[in-house]
């Protein structure tokens, strides 16, 4: 927040407030638009955090969220196994591990090889098609992000953002749709990609 304030604090239409997203210092029905990008899945309960946020939305107000999508089952298993260890690391230790994952991702990426899966493997959550080797490993087996523009620091940061936070929940589109229904929000847009789910809804 200090970085953001230094760069944009002089603008009259922007206000920076640092607070617990589950204990916000605002009255109910305060905002006409709420935007929460890649935040809710890092709270202790994504669904209840979302429900809490909607209390601050005025009638006919909009809310937009992005949450992590659930991955293939082996990737989910490995994520949980590794994260049980990385969340207990110091910042320095997890940074080093995140560098290891970036180097691994880079090594796989530099192969410049494709793999073709002739048909779906439902038990593994693998879809048929032709994949870059690094992308295939990344989406189906292990988070080892590598930025194709060779931005090493960004690659380390993306890996760190996955492995260090105490909470990093993944969800399905069905789950997210239910949150909106339960909060009496009508979904106006929904986009699901491998990494996550983006949804915007309006309060009825």
Feature map (PLM): residue ranges:
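A short SAM/SAH-binding and catalytic strip from SAM-dependent methyltransferases
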Residues: 32-45
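C-terminal lobe and adjacent flexible extensions of AdoMet/dcAdoMet transferase-like proteins
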Residues: 133-204
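A short glycine-rich, Lys/Arg-flanked "PGG" loop and its adjoining helix->strand segment in the class I
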Residues: 47-62
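Conserved class I S-adenosyl-L-methionine
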Residues: 62-116, 129-136
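A short acidic, Gly/Pro-enriched loop at the edge of an enzyme's catalytic core
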Residues: 22-34
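Conserved SAM-binding strand-loop segment of SAM-dependent methyltransferases
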Residues: 10-23
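Conserved SAM-binding loop
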Residues: 4-5
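Short conserved AdoMet
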Residues: 9, 44, 58
